[in-house]
């Protein structure tokens, strides 16, 4: 959909505590990319008082950036170079991890859910 590719790095953008925090989840969801392919948030505990909505995947921060990068138009620009410069200015404040995701490597795995996989797994086992 919209050209989004698998992004297993989406979940490692957030810590184990962030993926359990109801305020964080309402604002950002539990992964930076829906293309991380994590079916639900298994780290949340009953005591976290998270609703079902926050347990389900949704578009994340990376997804919005990728869609804007691929589809944004610059009506005032005169050439592709000006478009590229405008895009770089737009994304200056974002982490390089959002700009160039890694989908393979020791840092990322399918189903890892956070940057702290052992801590997150501990939460899951408590459920």
Could you say what each language-model-derived stretch is?
Residues 11-127:
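Conserved catalytic/binding loops enriched for acidic/polar residues
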Residues 1-13:
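Catalytic Zn2+-binding segment of zinc metalloproteases
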């Amino acid at each position: 959909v919209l050209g989004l590719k698998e992004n297993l790095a989406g979940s490692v953008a957030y810590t184990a505590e962030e993926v359990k925090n109801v305020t964080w989840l309402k604002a950002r969801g539990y992964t930076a990319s829906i293309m991380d392919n994590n079916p639900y948030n298994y780290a949340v505990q009953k005591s976290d008082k998270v609703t079902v909505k926050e347990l389900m995947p949704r578009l994340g921060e990376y997804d919005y950036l990728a869609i804007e990068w691929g589809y944004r138009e610059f009506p005032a620009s005169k050439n592709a170079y000006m478009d590229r410069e405008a895009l770089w200015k737009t994304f200056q404040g974002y982490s390089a991890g959002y700009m160039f995701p890694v989908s393979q490597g020791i840092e990322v795995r399918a189903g890892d859910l956070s940057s702290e996989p052992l801590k997150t797994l501990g939460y899951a086992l408590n459920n």
